[in-house]
Amino acid sequence: MKTLLLTLVVVTIVCLDLGYTLTCLICPEKYCQKVHTCRDGENLCVKRFYEGKRFGKKYPRGCAATCPEAKPHEIVECCSTDKCNK
C-alpha cells in the first residue's frame, strides 16, 4: 500500500511539473499589462529598450528560447519567472 501511495505522489509531482508554461508581458508600450502564454521551449521573458528616430522610446516585450544579443543603442533584459519583463 505504501508503495502505491509513493508511486502516485511521484507521478503527480512529475505531471504537475510538465504542465508549467511561462507567461510574459507582450506589448511595445512602457506600461504593459497584456499577458501572453509562451510556447514550449520559450523559457525566457524578454524586454528590449531603444529609442526610435520617428516614434520615440520603444519597449518591445515577449517570450524567447534564448536571450537575444543587444543591437547597438539597445538594452535587452531577460528573466525566467512569470510576467518578470515589466
Swiss-Prot record:
Stretch forming the signal peptide: 1-21
Family matches, as CDD domains: TFP_snake_toxin
One GO cellular component term: extracellular region
Keyword Disulfide bond: yes
Compartment(s): Secreted
Any GO MF annotation of the entry: acetylcholine receptor inhibitor activity
Tissue and organ distribution: Expressed by the venom gland.
Pfam family membership, one: Toxin_cobra-type
InterPro entries: Snake_3FTx (IPR003571), Snake_toxin-like_sf (IPR045860), Snake_toxin_con_site (IPR018354), Toxin_cobra-type (IPR054131)
Keywords for the protein's UniProt record, in alphabetical order: Acetylcholine receptor inhibiting toxin, Disulfide bond, Ion channel impairing toxin, Neurotoxin, Postsynaptic neurotoxin, Secreted, Signal, Toxin
Cysteines engaged in disulfide bonds, as pairs: 24-45, 27-32, 38-63, 67-78, 79-84
Entry's family note: Belongs to the three-finger toxin family. Ancestral subfamily. Orphan group II sub-subfamily.
Function recorded in the entry: Binds with low affinity to muscular (alpha-1-beta-1-delta-epsilon/CHRNA1-CHRNB1-CHRND-CHRNE) and very low affinity to neuronal (alpha-7/CHRNA7) nicotinic acetylcholine receptor (nAChR).
Protein name: Neurotoxin 3FTx-LT
Organism: Bungarus fasciatus (Banded krait)
